[in-house]
């Protein structure tokens, strides 16, 4: 069995191929690339096209190494950043980086609608300028609300890449849960937060739990990549959640998780 994993970080991306044979497992890194944000006209963006290209380069290597026999593929990444697509799957805007200053410019007005304490009580998330909620609210503040109004779906970066592979729109649970828009008590999006900041609920994909077998890659992608196709699985897309899940925790231990901030 050949399992391919794509870990996208804020400074680089890596693809690992795991081969399971009887009771043995071997893991090899097959592709690595740099991921750098780009400043343009006072805003900060991710080069999502290059990320997609590099992901495909790694997938192509896995296809060659396995004789086109990939049994499962999954993605995790940093949280909060997203792409907005129309019904044809076209990106409506470049993908902003969480370090962009637009949230800082409008933080006071955003927090005047719901205080930091109220937001924490509703979502359970830390108050941070990079949260997805802050980014979406800042879009309204900067006169870009029409993009939200005309968007078909808002997809977190792993879900956006999965959409390009499968044509399916989802919102994975762990990465949704740290957006500052999720209600853990109701196990659903927090309608009070969405209503307060005029964020249309319809733009979110179907909430999907880790462990879900989403299905195979779409035919157009298979033709482009010259592959028979492969199954896509949903894991803990929030990279910190995946790190904790795979850690050998016991009752008497401490774990420090750190990445690129």
Question: Residues of each region from the PLM?
Answer:
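Short, hydrophobic/amphipathic alpha-helical packing segments
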Residues: 52-60, 136, 238-242
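Short beta-strand-to-turn element immediately C-terminal to the catalytic PLP-Schiff-base lysine
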Residues: 18-20, 83-86, 139-141, 163-164, ...
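Catalytic phosphate/nucleotide-handling subdomain of diverse soluble enzymes
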Residues: 231, 236-261
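Gly/Ser/Thr-rich active-site cleft segment
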Residues: 8-10, 120-240
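N-terminal glycine/serine-rich phosphate-binding loop of ATP-dependent small-molecule kinases
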Residues: 1-93, 121, 222-233
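Carbohydrate-associated surface elements
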Residues: 100
